[in-house]
Amino acid sequence: MIFPDGTAKKLTEEGYVLEKHLFERWIAEEAVSEGAQLQLSHKLRSMEKQYDANGKFTGWLCDGNGEQFPIQTKVIIDASGVAAVASKILDLNTRGQVIAGMQYEMLEVPTDDYLDFYIWPEYAEKGYLWMIPKCDGRANVGLVTEDKPRTKKALDEFIEATHFKDLEQVPPPWKEKGNPAFGGTIPISGPFELTYDDGLMLVGDAAGFTSPLFEGGSHLALKSATFAADVAAEQIAANDLSASKMSRYQKLWSNEFPPYGKILRGKSALFDLTDEDMSIMAQCFPDEMSNMGPHGKLAVCLRLLMRRPSLYGKRIIPAMLSFGYSRAKFYGW
């Protein structure tokens, strides 16, 4: 992690970098091999609950654009991403906040196999920038920012001001022409209040499941999908798809996922700090942050408060804790 004054600290965890377009294609192929049907060029427009003569919920009637519509189904698992289609159609939740993300794939990027996270508000307002190494000297260089209109300009300015300046940018494999930049929007408000209804569960970004500080979401999506699949199978077998039974899904992910409220408060506190405050905080961290136990964290807090007592009033402790909760073992990054 690189802070505004250039102070760099390590938080070491082993992990994998996914070529996401290949990973998602593989998931789809695996599903089809197990009997799923993959229907492209379809857009859901409406969802209507179905009931039997006794008023018991029996499933959904879905309509929209595409040759397979209308579709009748017992359970819907909404994995529609940030669009959160089912939630929007049913007015199930208020729309959450989103942040803009954009990146380039670059060639011959110097790397030590660590992911570099730059917490530099000058370029990424209430966000951060990254360098994510991939195979064969390739890397993704990008940012997320709440200043959505300035996203691409800010990324270009960051690249121009750093050692990435003269590196070649190439379009991603699925983008044959046009500007090589690619990205989209990411939910940042935390989980929706309701992630279930009669015969319905929301997973991944469609449920607001992203890591609050660094906005990663693949492992949260995969785990929530596993929970949803288990609940769907059990409730179909039990012939009870009522919301009261589907609510078990929300209990499962609530017990598994990190304390979103704490992380969001810590994130807010972090971005309330000035660049100088952030840099002083970084200088008080050990060079390797992954091994800090309770005593190590206490020592950092004491060093911070001795150097700048005013940081206590700026909620520096929640800001520091947000880093710990953003590690991979807590579904972070």
Stretches found by the model and what they are:
Residues 8-11, 139-141, 209-212:
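Short small-residue beta-strand/loop micro-motif enriched in glycine and branched aliphatics
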Residues 17, 46, 149-231, 236-237, ...:
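FAD/FMN-dependent oxidoreductases across multiple families
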Residues 233-333:
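C-terminal helical "tail/cap" subdomain of flavin- and related membrane-associated enzymes
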Residues 1-30:
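A conserved beta-strand/loop capping segment in the N-terminal third of enzymes
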Residues 26, 30-173, 187, 192, ...:
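Predominantly flavin-linked oxidoreductase catalytic cores and closely associated redox partners
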